């Protein structure tokens, strides 16, 4: 750089530099302790859920009359990606998914549009439809969950204590929302004997009317006086069971109380709904979500204090136990990564001391905390929390941030060895290194551009990677210009009179010979390198594919599905049997069970499933990750042996966006029947793949149904109709809700049913008396033909088409992503080609998300390439030099792919990011070498000598910085998330650096026709 020499300025104004060093370290430490803490970075879940219920309707009916019109209306949503729906008897759940390109700032606007679209369609839905309801807070995370348990305490008693605790926790700092789980709703049942009802000359509808009138909340008006308004309140609402029993009933001239002719009881709703257990004990859960921008560790401490207060006030025998403790998990995660960061700092410092010597090592050791603290200040300013991505990125950048400092320090050391004084050495280092270092830093940062500017959920998840590493690299360049010269001026020592050539030792002589050989046989070197590169690229199909690996968290998510139509009672019994098997297993730390429902989203990387009576879920927490896999396998084996009709699936928490199964393929078609037929054929082919396990479809078998064909003429003659018959059957078989009882903050339904009717058997259905009007009862078999059939009880759709997902798990050494690709491209290729028009088989789940993410990641690559070439052009000023430096970029792939292949590590998102970044780092080294050649030519050296001496002069700093970078990645190897990146970086950078130092001189000499001496 011409003009002002910033290194000289910094040395002449040392006090200013020292002031900023102290200020940055102080500000960095303050920022570190005030940064937000989380296990994973936040990302936007672009999904809203629309639900509706239509009691009594079949899955086919509700699909045609409710799901289909709602889906068609929702197709008008701006930025819509796809719509997926789950329709079951009497209810539908519609998932509206927006494109990843929709900015998160516009998400709430889209949800408002969805509300308007649904409201527009509401009036067109059949009468009796409840809803639609919209949940646009599907991404709320309940990281702290507590269970209230206690033998001898009823659900209602536990609910009341939980409700009190909920109110108090709502006021705790950083708490956004508190929800109760596993609450069993109460219901008041008014049961009458059918014969007694008939003896009074009463019909069920008479009782309905009386209960509805007495239970209705109606305003009684307001009295307006000159001074005030006085409201009139009418007492006598049905707020207790006793008030119901005392309800007067008049039949003709007779008068009596409801309790005289009916049994009135308040009990838990039958059947039960959404049960929760903790360690096998019935529980009421308290789920707490953190406010946006909150600190998990602060929240954890605040909750711990409040819960301790609550425990002291609970009666003996009632306990509060922690089910999920995200603050503790975050604390452990931050501790582990902070430990890895410190290990990386120690490793890099040790390498610096060994390679540069004690005093030069001191300079580098002092530069590291300055840059790290400056990075913490930047993170605090930008609102980037400490989590797996940001801390991992700091470790990644640690090796890179010392590169510029190493180059400056090494150059100062060389100049001092050549006899310059300290100020002149600093000036020379700045003059020779500042501009190429800046270009190299910008190019290295540009290599990470695809991560920072890609669209999509995955890119959002790791988006902090680019911003942290780019800022750290730029800050490291600033430090190398201002801090390194000042500290080098102060600390670097060379013995008096000591002058030694940079090429004195044996390593340099060997390297000198290698360079000379490469220049002599430059065409062979170039062709050989190209062949090695091509051969390595050909290895890619043989490298395992896995976009995001499983985490090391100890949780096992166990989903158990019984045959469609199974009652919640049966599901409860199965889940209780599984819990019994876990008692006494020392591999189990704790387990929570959810019957008829799913666990709440206790971490962002967990997707709750839709409620279903035949579904149970257990969150098993293993003692540690070492016993996790054996616990999972043994539990699945127990279920398969003891409950052969149940379909169990265990999954682990991933380190990226989640999927229900590791292997998923979806088949969509025109109609339900053919779609199901083709899906069964595809599932059979998938099952034949070697090592496939647990192959299933999300489309259950048909369930039994009783179909009544009413004789309309006969019923009308008897004074009845379809509605009255359906209602009478509902009263007898299930109980009919007729009113509500207002009890504090609880709204308790009042249902009427006939005594003993809930025990009706299928065999007795034809003789069941039904009311047909005028007080007459006739056997059901006299007015209806009764048939027993099977029908589809569940229909999945995607973008208006019936869709069946084929799921499974991979066995053996291959990753799930690799298996899906082989299934799709080979096993199912012929099947796909022969599908009729309108039927498609596509990848689903994690592999589909990964392919989308790769596309998003590839989109900014042209911009990255352009920026790198532009920086090269400005720095090297010649197109041939730009091309030479540019084509060395892909050399990093050689070592990266070989490393992944040899270590059996998967190629996934982070390893792809690593390969993109490697290109920038390799080009950076080429710039430094080519710039040195240009300087030597400007000093009057012959072309051959300029190339040889430049390569030898830059050999030490380039290799030293590369080795330091590699050592900085070592602490990342234990992390499943970062391991593929670390492996690809270590292998790629080492090999690319070695090859680059030999190939760049060969390319330069080949293009510029530089020849060496005839005899070497």
Model regions and ranges:
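Transmembrane alpha-helices and their membrane-interface boundaries in multi-pass membrane transporters
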Residues: 398-412, 434-453, 460-499, 618, ...
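Signature of alpha-helical transmembrane segments and their immediate interfacial
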Residues: 1-37, 433, 499-548, 665
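Solvent-exposed, non-transmembrane alpha-helical starts
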Residues: 19, 58-65, 102-112, 142-146, ...
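Extracytoplasmic/periplasmic membrane-proximal domains and adjacent transmembrane bundles
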Residues: 9, 51, 122, 168-346, ...
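Transmembrane helices with small-residue packing motifs
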Residues: 15-16, 23-57, 119-128, 380, ...
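Helix-loop junctions and hydrophobic alpha-helical segments within the transmembrane domains
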Residues: 323, 330, 334, 409, ...
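Hydrophobic transmembrane alpha-helices and their membrane-interface caps
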Residues: 30-34, 346-413, 471, 867-954, ...
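Solvent-exposed, membrane-proximal periplasmic/extracellular interface segments of envelope transport
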Residues: 4-6, 61-137, 195-216, 237, ...
């Amino acid at each position: 750089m011409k003009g002002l020499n910033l290194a000289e300025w910094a040395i002449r104004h040392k006090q200013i530099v020292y002031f900023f060093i102290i200020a940055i370290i102080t500000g960095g430490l303050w920022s570190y302790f005030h940064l937000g803490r989380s296990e994973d970075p936040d990302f936007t879940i672009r999904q809203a859920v629309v639900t509706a219920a239509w009691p009594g309707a079949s899955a086919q009916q509700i699909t045609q009359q409710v799901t289909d019109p709602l889906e068609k209306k929702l197709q008008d949503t701006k930025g819509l990606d796809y719509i997926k729906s789950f329709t079951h008897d009497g209810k539908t759940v519609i998932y509206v998914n927006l494109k990843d390109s929709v900015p998160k700032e516009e998400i709430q606007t889209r949800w408002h549009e969805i509300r308007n679209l649904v409201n527009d369609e509401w009036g067109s839905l059949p009468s009796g439809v409840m809803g639609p309801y919209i949940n646009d807070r599907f991404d709320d995370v309940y990281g702290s969950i507590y269970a209230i348990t206690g033998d001898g305490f009823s659900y209602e008693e536990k609910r009341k204590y939980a409700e009190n605790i909920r109110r108090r926790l709502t006021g705790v700092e950083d708490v956004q929302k508190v929800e109760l789980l596993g609450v069993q709703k109460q219901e008041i049942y008014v049961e009458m004997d059918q014969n007694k009802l008939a003896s009074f000359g009463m019909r069920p509808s008479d009782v309905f009317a009386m209960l509805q009138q007495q239970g209705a909340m109606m305003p009684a008006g307001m009295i307006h006086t000159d001074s005030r308004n006085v409201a009139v309140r009418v007492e006598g609402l049905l707020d207790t069971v006793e008030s119901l029993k005392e309800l007067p009933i008049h039949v003709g001239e007779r008068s009596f109380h409801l309790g005289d002719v009916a049994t009135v009881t308040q009990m838990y709703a039958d059947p039960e709904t959404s049960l929760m257990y903790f360690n096998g004990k019935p529980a009421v859960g308290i789920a707490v979500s953190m406010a946006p921008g909150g600190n998990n560790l602060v929240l954890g401490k605040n909750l711990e204090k409040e819960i301790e207060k609550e425990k002291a006030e609970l009666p003996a025998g009632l306990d509060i136990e922690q089910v999920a403790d995200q603050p503790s998990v975050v604390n452990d995660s931050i501790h582990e990564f902070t430990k890895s960061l410190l290990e990386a700092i120690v490793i890099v410092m040790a390498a610096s001391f060994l390679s540069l010597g004690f005093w030069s090592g001191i300079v580098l050791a002092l530069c590291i905390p300055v840059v790290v603290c400056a990075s913490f200040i930047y993170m605090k300013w930008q609102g980037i929390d400490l989590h797996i991505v940001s801390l991992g990125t700091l470790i990644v950048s640690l090796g890179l941030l010392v590169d510029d400092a190493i180059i400056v320090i090494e150059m100062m050391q060389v100049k001092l060895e050549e006899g310059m004084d300290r100020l002149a050495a600093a000036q020379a280092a700045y003059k020779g290194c500042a501009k190429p270092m800046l270009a190299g830093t910008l190019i290295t940062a540009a290599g990470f551009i695809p991560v920072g500017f890609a669209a999509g959920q995955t890119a959002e998840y790791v988006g902090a990677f680019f911003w942290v590493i780019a800022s750290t690299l730029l800050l490291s360049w600033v430090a190398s210009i201002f801090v390194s010269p000042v500290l080098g001026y102060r600390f670097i020592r060379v013995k008096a009179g000591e002058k030694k050539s940079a090429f004195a030792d044996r390593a340099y002589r060997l390297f000198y010979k290698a360079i000379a050989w490469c220049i002599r046989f430059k065409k062979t070197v170039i062709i050989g390198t190209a062949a090695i590169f091509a051969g390595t690229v050909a290895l890619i199909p043989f490298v395992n594919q896995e976009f995001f690996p499983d985490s090391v968290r100890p949780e096992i998510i166990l989903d158990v599905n019984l045959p469609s139509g199974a009652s919640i009672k049966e599901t409860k019994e199965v889940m209780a049997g599984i819990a019994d098997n876990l008692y006494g297993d020392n591999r189990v730390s704790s387990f929570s069970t959810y019957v008829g429902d799913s666990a709440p989203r206790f971490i962002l990387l967990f997707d709750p499933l839709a409620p279903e009576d035949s579904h149970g879920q257990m969150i098993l927490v293993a003692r540690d990750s070492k016993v996790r896999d054996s616990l999972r396998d043994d539990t699945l084996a127990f279920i398969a042996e003891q409950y052969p009709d149940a379909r169990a699936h265990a999954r682990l928490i991933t380190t990226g966006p989640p999927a229900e199964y590791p292997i998923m393929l979806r088949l969509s078609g025109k109609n339900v029947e053919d779609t199901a037929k083709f899906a069964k054929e595809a599932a059979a082919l998938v099952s034949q793949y070697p090592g496939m396990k647990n192959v299933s479809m999300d489309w259950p078998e048909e369930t039994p149904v009783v179909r009544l064909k009413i004789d309309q003429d006969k019923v009308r003659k008897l004074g009845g109709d379809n509605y009255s018959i359906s209602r009478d059957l509902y009263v007898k078989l299930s109980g009919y809700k007729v009113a509500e009882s207002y009890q504090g903050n609880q709204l308790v339904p009042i249902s009427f049913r006939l005594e003993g009717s809930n025990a009706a058997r299928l065999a007795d259905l034809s003789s069941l008396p039904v009311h047909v009007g005028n007080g007459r009862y006739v056997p059901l078999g006299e007015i209806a033909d009764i048939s027993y059939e099977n029908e589809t009880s569940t229909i999945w759709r995607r973008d208006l088409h019936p869709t069946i997902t084929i799921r499974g798990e991979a066995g053996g050494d291959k990753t799930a992503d690799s298996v899906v690709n082989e299934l799709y491209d080979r096993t199912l290729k012929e099947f796909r080609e022969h599908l009729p028009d309108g039927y498609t088989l596509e990848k689903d789940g994690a592999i589909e998300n990964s392919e989308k993410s790769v596309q998003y990641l590839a989109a900014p690559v042209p911009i990255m390439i352009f920026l790198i070439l532009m920086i090269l052009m400005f720095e090297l000023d010649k197109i041939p030099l730009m091309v030479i430096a540019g084509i060395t970029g892909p050399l990093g792939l050689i070592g990266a792919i070989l490393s992944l292949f040899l270590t059996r590590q998967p190629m996934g998102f982070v390893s792809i990011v690593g390969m993109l970044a490697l290109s920038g780092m390799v080009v950076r080294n080429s710039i430094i070498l080519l710039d040195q050649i240009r300087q030597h030519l400007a000093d009057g050296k012959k072309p051959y000598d300029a190339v040889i001496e430049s390569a030898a002069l830059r050999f030490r700093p380039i290799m030293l910085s590369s080795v330091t970078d590699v050592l900085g990645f070592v602490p990342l190897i234990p992390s499943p998330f970062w391991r593929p990146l670390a492996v690809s970086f270590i292998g790629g950078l080492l090999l690319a650096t070695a090859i680059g130092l030999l190939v760049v001189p060969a390319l330069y000499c080949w293009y510029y026709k530089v020849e060496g001496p005839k005899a070497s």
